[in-house]
Structures are given as C-alpha cells and as structure tokens.
Amino acid sequence: MSARAGRLGIGIIGAGHVGPILGAALAGAGHAIIGISAVSDESRDRAEAILPSAPILDIPVIVERSELVILAVPDAELPALVEGLAATSSWRAGQLVLHTAAGFGTAVLAPAQALGAIPLAIHPAMDFTGTSIDIGRLGETWFAVTAPVPVQPIGQALVVEMGGEPVIVAENDRAAYAEAIEIATAFSRSIVAQATGILSEIGVEHPGGFLSSLVRSSVDNALRETSRPESIEPLDGEDF
C-alpha cells in the first residue's frame, strides 16, 4: 500500500501549531482534507486561516469519514484519545492512524490497531510557529517515522509528499529521540532568551534581530561540524 496510490481523505484531530500545517502540506500534494477539530477560538482561527476550505467537525465525525486520521494533540492527551475512540469502536479496519507526538511510537495506537487500523508515528523535527511560514520550512525538515516494517513505506511516502525527509526510528528508540528533541529545543530557547535579555539591559534595540544572523550561523556551523566524517583531518594551515 502506498500513500501515492491515490488521493486520501484526511481528517485532523487538533488545530494546534502542527496539525493544520501538515494538513496544508498534504492538501498541496493532492489529498483531500475531510475536516479538522478545533476547540478554542485561537485554534479555530488557525484552522480557518491555514485550511480555509476544511470544515471544523467533531472528532467522531472526522474519524468516521477519514481514510487517514492525523492525531496532532499534546503527548499527555494522546493515550486517552486513542483509547476513548477505541471504546466506542470508532476506528475502522484499514484506516491509517498517524500521531505526531515525539515521545511515543506506535504502541500507543494499539487500541486502534486492535480494531484493524494501521498505525504510524511521524514526528517532524521542527519548532512550529503555527503559521503559514511553517509550510515552507517543511522542505528542510527531517521526520522521524516509526511503524511496523510493512507500513514504513507509507510513512516515508507521506513525509516526502509533505516535502520532508524521512528517517526510520525504532519503537524502542522513541524515548531517546524525544529526549534529543527536547534538549535541542529547550537549550536553543534558553540561550537565546538569556542573550537577548543581556542586550536589552545594555540598551540594544531589537536584540532578537541583532542576534539572528549570529545564532543561525553558529547553529549551522555546529551542525556542519557534527556531520563531518571523523576520518577527515584538516591539513596543516587549512581552516575548515
């Protein structure tokens, strides 16, 4: 089975920073957005701005109508959501169920899988703003894909259709993966906040803009260094 075999009817549960963006990317690849759930006024506004043609529907209706259900909810809410929908026999055989939580693999989708649903855990390694700018950033983003081996090509195809690069992460490695994501995100925010605070105290206007080029180039250089083969030693007099 391949996500490229035809257009999927996609339902999105959660209109936070991630769900509408992934929905927009998949809609751009030719899939149909059946509906999206949104509770707060802020999430409704976000859904309407990013997916203006997608109706805002109740969760059971979305699950009933969708071939692919994207669960873009906070990690803490995911287990209860999956179990609750299983308790009402909402999941269907052959239906794709995809969650975006970094800290979970597909085990959390076991209640849906028991009813015949096909589980996928796909996490984009990106700090989302929840605005349309994120759609363009997907093209430079790696996605962690966790799924049973026969299902991995589906997850990889969906990532490619969203413009990203897929990398397989084993079920047992999801906790370590989530830790790495949290460290990178929290550290970056903490350091930037500390540095901009110091600049503000000494009277530098717009400290975020002042540090933008420095922070981006420093991070790029650090990432480039981690990708450098250890076997390559710089020649005397050369500065890589």
Question: What residue ranges belong to the model's regions?
Answer:
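NAD(P)+-binding Rossmann beta1-loop-alpha1 motif at the extreme N-terminus of oxidoreductases
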Residues: 1-64
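NAD(P)-dependent Rossmann-like dehydrogenase/reductase catalytic/cofactor-binding core
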Residues: 2-4, 208-240
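Phosphate-coordination loops involved in phosphoryl transfer and adenosine-cofactor binding
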Residues: 6-9, 94, 140
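Hydrophobic Val/Ile/Leu positions in short beta-strands of Rossmann-like dinucleotide-binding domains
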Residues: 11-12, 71, 145
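Short phosphate-binding/catalytic loops that engage adenosine nucleotides
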Residues: 31-32, 117, 164, 204
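Short, hydrophobic beta-strand segments that form beta-sheet elements in well-ordered domains
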Residues: 34-38, 97-100, 145
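Rossmann-like NAD(P)(H) cofactor-binding subdomain of soluble oxidoreductases
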Residues: 45, 55-133
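Internal alpha-helical scaffold of NAD(P)-dependent oxidoreductase catalytic cores
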Residues: 46-50, 112, 133-224
